[in-house]
Amino acid sequence: MEKLILRRVDRQNEEMILNFGPQHPSTHGVINFLVETDGEVLKRATPDVGYLHRSIEKIGEMVGYPGFMPYTDRVDYVAAMFANEGYAIAVERLLKIEVPQRAQWLRAISCELCRIASHLVSVGTMVMDIGAFTPMLHGIRERETINDLLEALCGARLTYNYHRIGGVAFDLPEGWRDKVLHFLDHFDKFLAEFDRLISFNEIYVKRLANVAVIPGPMAINYGLVGPNLRGSGVDWDVRRDLPYGAYPNFKFDVPVGKGFFGTSGDSFDRYYVRCLEMAESSKIVRQALDSLPEGEITAKVPRNIKPEAGEAIGRVESARGELAYYVISDGTNKAYRVRARTGSFTAMCIIEDISRGLMVADLVALISSLDVVAPEIDR
């Protein structure tokens, strides 16, 4: 990205240079954009990140392997389960540990519920950013029910620390399965209602269709992942194409953008792919609960973890796409190197190219459609 040089502008025209953030409600975290406009048209929008940098990768090299697990929750506090699982898989591969089947199923259940909760925040805040406040409250209402379920499962509502090296921390509490199924019965009806009221609303469609189009090849070149990549028509999902855990045992579809109301890869496609993914997550949770095997929930893991010297990658399909941990062991009880590859950073990189020529109001829609989360950007 080129550096935006601040300069004087002619007062006789409508050019402006302003800061969009870092505390703007539409930036979804402490993110700043240096925005150059000509009237209501964007000439340039340069992301300015780093406001939430906490050296989390370096922390992973300073504490023991189990000690870093609670920090992974902070990589993406909106969908923390996935960051737990990605790191756990990487360390398990270093240790050559086989995770019990029941633990793999519990991981899938918790992650898919977390995916639904994250997507509810994404689609709800997207509608709110465009100007409709009430639908966001509908999404938060459903998310609160999921938070209650996850709190009953692991004792926390946002930063779960549920996945552990070798398995999971807790088994299902009594009656939890029935509560989840009852919620899913209601949630499937909620999705249909949300589509009717919001997704297919004429005003909403006009605000998103054909806006901020990202063609498939461009999405690949920028390294987009998850719903942002699939929204551009690229059929790629780590759960299916690089299967891990219990996912090979479940049947589910991978929604991709098809130009539902406009052009493939526009803001509406990115939005609606997330809506369709919530329905698929509901299917996966039902299958996992129906086929949940008996057995242990954690493998035998040494108290003092010292993997042999080597390297491993743990990748999962998070709510924001492929989340990968690259961990290097030097044979001690602390990692030599921990690297997290997240989807939000690459999504930020594409904004400058895509935003040129948009209206200022459409920049808000573009940021929302990419579903960036600040701690995933600043690591």
Curated annotation (Swiss-Prot):
Task: Tell me which UniProt keywords the record has, alphabetically.
Answer: Cell inner membrane, Cell membrane, Membrane, NAD, Quinone, Translocase, Transport, Ubiquinone
| Localization | Cell inner membrane
Q: Which InterPro entries match?
A: NADH_Q_OxRdtase_suD (IPR001135), NDH1_su_D/H (IPR022885), NiFe-Hase_large (IPR029014)
For this protein, the record's SUPFAM superfamilies field holds: HydB/Nqo4-like
What is catalyzed by this enzyme? a quinone + NADH + 5 H(+)(in) = a quinol + NAD(+) + 4 H(+)(out)
What is the membrane topology listed in the Swiss-Prot or TrEMBL record? Peripheral membrane protein
- UniProt keyword Ribonucleoprotein present: no
One GO cellular component assignment for this chain's record is: plasma membrane
User: Which protein are we looking at?
Assistant: NADH-quinone oxidoreductase subunit D 1
**Which organism is the protein's source?**
Anaeromyxobacter sp. (strain K)
Q: List the taxonomic lineage.
A: Bacteria, Pseudomonadati, Myxococcota, Myxococcia, Myxococcales
Designated gene of the protein: nuoD1
